[in-house]
Amino acid sequence: AAVLPPYRRLVLDEAHHVEDTAAAHLGRQVTSRGVERLLARLERQNRGVLPALRAALVAEADETLREAALELLHARVEPALADARRSAELLFRYLDAFLAGKADNVVRLGDGFAEDPIWAGGLGDALDGLGYGLSTLREALITLAERITGEWEPGERIESLLGELRGACSRLEAARDAVRTALRPPAGAPPLVRWIERRGAAHVALAAVPLELAPLLKALLFDRVETVTLTSATLATGGTFDFLTSRLGLDLPPPREGVREVLASPFNYHEQCLFALPDDVPEPRDDAEGHGARVAAVAADLARAADGGLFALFTSHRALRQAAAVLKARPDVAGRWPLLVQGDAPRDQLLRRFRDAGSAILLGTDSFWEGVDVPGQALRALLIAKLPFRVPTEPLTAARCEAIEASGGDAFNEYLVPLAGLKLKQGFGRLIRSRTDVGVVVLLDPRVLRKRYGARLLAGLPPARRVVGSWEELRRDIEEFFELHGIGRDE
């Protein structure tokens, strides 16, 4: 059933997320812990929906219905639940053992997976067993609910518990279908990207996502409404919307009339923002250790010049932890300004502490690149450690790149570079949030200066005053900029 009432006009803000959001909702995903929690919600150690329903029936139902329902619970539902739990544990043990023999925690499942020895080793029987177990449990729960409501009008308490049972039935069906689709997709299914992932000890995830989302978005979303408005600070790449329209299916026939417009920023970036590009930084791919050390050193210099008020954005948790360890060990940094590190506290709490402190240093990864609004002088310096390219071996990214290459395209320049440009623009946009904000952005990835695609990435950024040179030269430029605006250390 639809959640929203009928509508003819659709407005999507932050529309640069549409493709990834569609992948999450049109694909299927299930985890071992998710199945475990679903079954435990029904009953575990005499707690859950079923024990509560049993107690409510004893207290409220007449004798005939009570005995019939309790007999169903005992004879069909409880054995089906135990069988489903055993089947789930067996299947995910097989998958955990399969991942244990792999070098990576994420394994993409191609056509060759159907011939893997794991099937002959018992995975096929385990998959069939789980499918049967979840289906049998679902049918038993439906029968129980129908027996209760067919012969009696339950009170509010029992009706609420039956609502939970119906929800569990839907989730059981979704889990069963997700496991089947990821491991053994039906013949004739559209191209899927499938993978298995280890997320921790005995925690396995399965996923299957349609490779081609553009036709689905067009048919299921855009063609069903009269008008669509897409807005975001980062929809255009290279001054056009071609990348977005191709990824979302907006260029598929039949064509629709539309207005495409890039609106000018209300901010005077040339006056409000200095954009520093050091040219003497080690390349992160060639010298990861040296680059990491330079990031920490520049972060300390930048914090000193701005007297705190620094965001440092990273593309990996490993790089973040490396920089955090160095900065925490420096009394001239951690002893002077509050050092806030993603993972040490919830995101909202870190942001609140950053705003309240007024002179803190915050180190963050993906979730801090966008959706963060800190106007005013609490944020006056932004350090971007590395260009935000997607990991090319991530299953969905790899499959999309392969599809582009197979059709004669250039996946790096047609897909990875535009995505990096959108992400970089989002990160850059954390700094200037009002007409009175001023600050400095430092990008510590020399590839933007040395590689051909660098000019494309820079062209998509706001028109801040740009300076290029050695870090020692740029540090003086930054100190002068802060001094001009009355910002800086007080030593």
Which residues fall in each region the model found?
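ASCE RecA-like P-loop NTPase motor cores
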Residues: A1-E491
